[in-house]
Amino acid sequence: MLSKNLLEALNDQMNHEYFAAHAYMAMAAYCDKESYEGFANFFIQQAKEERFHGQKIYNYINDRGAHAEFRAVSAPKIDFSSILETFKDSLSQEQEVTRRFYNLSEIARQDKDYATISFLNWFLDEQVEEESMFETHINYLTRIGDDSNALYLYEKELGARTFDEE
């Protein structure tokens, strides 16, 4: 059985994952508006991944005999000055998610809820990948700078991204 404190934190994180999906869709909308269809697809796939994460937490809460609680999702940032800004904001968002999962893990440890600790380890591993990916994209975009040909090629590369549930 999940403690009240842990259940509250899991519900918060589930809702935060859905907020992250909204934020990535807002980034996709910016990219589409600026005619960067490849980058838009990248962020759409990222949004799918966040929804999958939310669903994974939802399933876990229910599997533990508790109740998943959905809350209002606040509006994400919609104005960006550049593609680079969307990726920098993405990295900040992922760093916040990592911090949140560390906090969740600490609550589970305090509760000696070893099943939840095991469950959360998957997310912690995922966050290492997410932060590394965005740091790499930021580095590439910074190097590309104003080189429109390089940006075009990089957009095409990222536009090929798909998301497969694991």
UniProtKB/Swiss-Prot annotation:
Its EC number is 1.16.3.2. Keywords: Cytoplasm, Iron, Iron storage, Metal-binding, Oxidoreductase. It is found in: Cytoplasm. Fe cation 2 binds at residues 50, 94, 127. It holds the Pfam family Ferritin. Residues 2-145 form the Ferritin-like diiron domain. GO terms for molecular function: ferric iron binding; ferrous iron binding; ferroxidase activity. GO terms for cellular component: cytoplasm; cytosol. Fe cation 1 binds at residues 17, 50, 53. PROSITE patterns: FERRITIN_LIKE. The keyword Cytoplasm applies. Induction: Induced by iron. Repressed by PerR. Negatively regulated by Fur. In addition, is regulated in a PerR-independent way under metal-depleted conditions. Iron-storage protein. Belongs to the ferritin family. Prokaryotic subfamily. This is Bacterial non-heme ferritin. It comes from Staphylococcus aureus (strain NCTC 8325 / PS 47).
